[in-house]
Amino acid sequence: MTKKSTKSEAASKTKKSGVPETGAQGVRAGGADHADAAHLGTVNNALVNHHYLEEKEFQTVAETLQRNLATTISLYLKFKKYHWDIRGRFFRDLHLAYDEFIAEIFPSIDEQAERLVALGGSPLAAPADLARYSTVQVPQETVRDARTQVADLVQDLSRVGKGYRDDSQACDEANDPVTADMYNGYAATIDKIRWMLQAIMDDERLD
């Protein structure tokens, strides 16, 4: 009769096989390890490669995807905050416009995160990660004034649009035309929203 393995023996075999005992990502809650590492010693990650990218190319592309993911989430939150904060004669116009702009950029959040996963990475989106990677800052204070809001958003959108164009070129040079093409599309959307807000800001009644 074959002797059944004990739990301790099973655990020993698990350790020898390299499969972690601490969950699918192999990290303990609150531990020092980060779930963003593409090469954690887990069964799942052992099956993941960077598709057609070399390691250096992947690092370049992954860096842009993580930064742009954090930036887009922050931009979404900023539009929402200003949507709630706005007061005055332009309340209804901007209150509704901000939600329309959010609807245009929101899909790119999931698209960028899933693109990173498809290439063998793991997106970070905790509050601390947003603060670390995002190029857009969400104000902690209440901002009621329409011109202050719009001018701030125009400045952010100008920077984000340029970032997408720069990152598109970087990804193209890193042998990833797919991500580069994604960024070109996002840049066009950001440019359109910036143009619309700039047109609103040019209205003298905004003061």
UniProtKB/Swiss-Prot annotation:
<dbReference type="GO" id="GO:0009295">
    <property type="term" value="C:nucleoid"/>
</dbReference>
<dbReference type="Pfam" id="PF00210">
    <property type="entry name" value="Ferritin"/>
</dbReference>
<keyword id="KW-0963">Cytoplasm</keyword>
<dbReference type="GO" id="GO:0008199">
    <property type="term" value="F:ferric iron binding"/>
</dbReference>
<dbReference type="GO" id="GO:0006879">
    <property type="term" value="P:intracellular iron ion homeostasis"/>
</dbReference>
<dbReference type="GO" id="GO:0005737">
    <property type="term" value="C:cytoplasm"/>
</dbReference>
<feature type="binding site">
    <location>
        <position position="114"/>
    </location>
    <ligand>
        <name>Fe cation 2</name>
    </ligand>
</feature>
<dbReference type="GO" id="GO:0016722">
    <property type="term" value="F:oxidoreductase activity, acting on metal ions"/>
</dbReference>
<feature type="region of interest" description="Disordered">
    <location>
        <begin position="1"/>
        <end position="31"/>
    </location>
</feature>
<dbReference type="InterPro" id="IPR023188">
    <property type="entry name" value="DPS_DNA-bd_CS"/>
</dbReference>
<dbReference type="GO" id="GO:0003677">
    <property type="term" value="F:DNA binding"/>
</dbReference>
<protein>
    <recommendedName>
        <fullName>DNA protection during starvation protein 1</fullName>
        <ecNumber>1.16.-.-</ecNumber>
    </recommendedName>
</protein>
<keyword id="KW-0479">Metal-binding</keyword>
<feature type="binding site" description="in other chain">
    <location>
        <position position="114"/>
    </location>
    <ligand>
        <name>Fe cation 1</name>
    </ligand>
</feature>
<dbReference type="InterPro" id="IPR009078">
    <property type="entry name" value="Ferritin-like_SF"/>
</dbReference>
<keyword id="KW-0409">Iron storage</keyword>
<feature type="binding site">
    <location>
        <position position="83"/>
    </location>
    <ligand>
        <name>Fe cation 1</name>
    </ligand>
</feature>
<keyword id="KW-0238">DNA-binding</keyword>
<comment type="function">
    <text>Protects DNA from oxidative damage by sequestering intracellular Fe(2+) ion and storing it in the form of Fe(3+) oxyhydroxide mineral. One hydrogen peroxide oxidizes two Fe(2+) ions, which prevents hydroxyl radical production by the Fenton reaction. Both oligomeric forms of dps exhibit ferroxidase activity and DNA binding. Dodecameric dps is capable of Fe(2+) oxidation/mineralization. Only dimeric dps affords efficient DNA protection against hydroxyl radical-mediated cleavage.</text>
</comment>
<feature type="binding site" description="in other chain">
    <location>
        <position position="110"/>
    </location>
    <ligand>
        <name>Fe cation 1</name>
    </ligand>
</feature>
<keyword id="KW-0560">Oxidoreductase</keyword>
<keyword id="KW-0408">Iron</keyword>
<dbReference type="InterPro" id="IPR012347">
    <property type="entry name" value="Ferritin-like"/>
</dbReference>
<comment type="subunit">
    <text>The 12 subunits form a hollow sphere into which the mineral iron core of up to 500 Fe(3+) can be deposited. The homododecameric forms at higher concentration of salt, the homodimeric form under reducing, low-salt conditions. The assembly of the dodecamer is irreversible.</text>
</comment>
<comment type="similarity">
    <text>Belongs to the Dps family.</text>
</comment>
<feature type="compositionally biased region" description="Basic and acidic residues">
    <location>
        <begin position="1"/>
        <end position="12"/>
    </location>
</feature>
<dbReference type="InterPro" id="IPR008331">
    <property type="entry name" value="Ferritin_DPS_dom"/>
</dbReference>
<dbReference type="InterPro" id="IPR002177">
    <property type="entry name" value="DPS_DNA-bd"/>
</dbReference>
